[in-house]
Amino acid sequence: MEEKQNAVLGTAPLGRLMMKFALPCTVSLLVGALYNIVDQIFIGWGVGYLGNGATNVVFPLTVLALGLAVMIGDGACSYVSICFGKNQPENANRAVGSAVALSVLVGIAVAVLYAVFQMPLLSLFGATEANLSYAKEYFTYITIGVPIYVFGQAINPIIRSDGSPQFAMLSMLAGAIANCILDPIAIFVLHWGVMGAAAATVAGQVITAAMGVWYLFHTKALRLKADNFKLRGRILGAYLPLGLCSFLAQISLVIAMAATNNMLVQYGAFSKYGADIPLTVLGIVMKVFQIIISITIGMAAGCIPIVGYNYGAQLLRRCRGVLWRLMGAEFLLGVLALLITQLFPRQIIDLFGSESELYNEFAVTTFRVYLCMLPLATVNKAAFIFMQAMGRPVESAGLSFFREVLLAVPLVMLLPKAFGLMGVLYSMPAADILTFFASCFVLLRTDRQLRK
């Protein structure tokens, strides 16, 4: 049964197979992104833009925890798929067991660090005098849920690699629905403000994690034993590098957000908008961008088991077929997202509360400038993940690091010197254009190798 299930990855029509795996993965990640969007919408109407500004300060710290989770989960997912392609099920079982144990330990460690260094971290990510009290309150409750969040996000790609993308999707969907129901109750009925939004988020994460625990006792191809949950250096060394791209993508984003938030506060203070409007607006735009990128990553990450299996089985023609189908779909997604954000920025920003005309003016400008290269951004992100699926962590992580650290951070620091606050907005499209050339080089070289 196990061999038959895995063999489908090497024989089924690629288009149908990609849809089968990518759709549930995309929905799972999209639902995860909606956690933040839902919080922003209800906080915007129930607390105001300072509350949204506070959640934007905390957001990079959530991304950091996510980065550690996906390094473990995506790395294990890639390794498990390759093991199945090579008919090495015991190595797959050991990788999953150690990934589960590691995610629990990492989640606890991160929560302790967040609790101990709360104030320095909030200051680092751009908290202002006006939003600091909201940020502290929100961050305190988010920190309590970090171990649960890390486990839930790490186990999700592992469930997909076991051939259950639909269950992975449902576990995320259940948590998100709970969050959507509890958010308005906590904010508008119980009047808990940002604390209520955080509590609703953690409650949703508990449901997702609980479903992940249930699945560990009802796996398909995997056969987990107590001995598999030990941390073995050889197994960790085999799969963690494969998740390095996912981690660097997130940690690089955290570094870029820290630089961006501080530049917004610094240059916004000398503009007509002040410090808090730019900080809040860009945070909301980034949440919308996260929805787009969640679809991008979902489409690409859903193909990881397909690429990993076929690469392990040396079915290179099928890997090449996935490559160009994926890149074409990602480019079309970017074009569609670009049209929506360019044509309807005011309608999008109105979802997050009613604010001043000055606020709306900066929001519209930010949408149209900051997101003007979305077709390139989606292709870049998919390129990072495809290289990870091929078992090439150096190229994958290198592209991600090049985009977020070597380009985005210097650009966001330098462009404001010439263009003021607008320079912060120019930094993202500039980084996407330059990264696109590097992505094309890597993808074309990979295509030549897959032709052989």
Which residues does each predicted region cover?
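Small-residue hotspots at the loop-to-helix junctions and early N-terminal turns
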Residues: 47-60, 135, 139, 198, ...
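Helix-terminus/linker motif at the lipid-water interface of multi-pass membrane proteins
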Residues: 34-52, 122-129, 185-192, 254-284, ...
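Short runs within selected transmembrane alpha-helices of multi-pass transporters and secretion channels
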Residues: 73, 142-160, 168-179, 197-210, ...
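Short alpha-helical transmembrane segments in multi-pass integral membrane proteins
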Residues: 1-22, 80-147, 189-244, 307-373, ...
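Hydrophobic transmembrane alpha-helices of multi-pass small-molecule transporters
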Residues: 64, 179-183, 209-213, 291, ...
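Transmembrane helical elements of multi-pass membrane transporters/channels
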Residues: 20-39, 141, 175, 204-208, ...
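Small-residue-rich hydrophobic transmembrane alpha-helices
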Residues: 52-112, 149-168, 279-345, 378-399
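Residue-level signal for short hydrophobic patches within transmembrane helices
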Residues: 15-34, 38, 61-68, 144, ...
